[in-house]
Amino acid sequence: NDYIPVIVPNDIDNESEYIDPRETALEIAEKMQADKLVYLSKYPGIYKDEERKDIYYKITVPEVEKLRKERNFPKEFDEIIGYGLQASKNGVNRVHILDGRIRHVLLIEFFSVNGAGTIFIETEAKLYLHELGK
């Protein structure tokens, strides 16, 4: 769509109504049928195991749903995963979860082979050629 909307938290302390930027970003991405939805968080991505040593760089929606049933993710992170799953099911091609504490994390994610966080997609058919090793 040639748009890059950026959604940020409320920045005025006297606002009486809280608007969740994660939920707002989800709704905008769904309405725009965005190619990508990016969440910056304090988590580096979805960990492969409970020891939190390695993260998935790419994972499918069914795999994320399975992990979500098997593990207890922190509440805030579980909400992000839930928004990402909803976006994926409602037409957003890719959801990226990135560690917002890393400098230049968006550049690293979009301009390197493995990226800097976890992306999840509906099916492996939506992977880019370089992600398939081709």
Regions found by a protein language model. Give the residues of each.
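C-terminal catalytic "cap/lid" subdomain
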Residues: 1-134
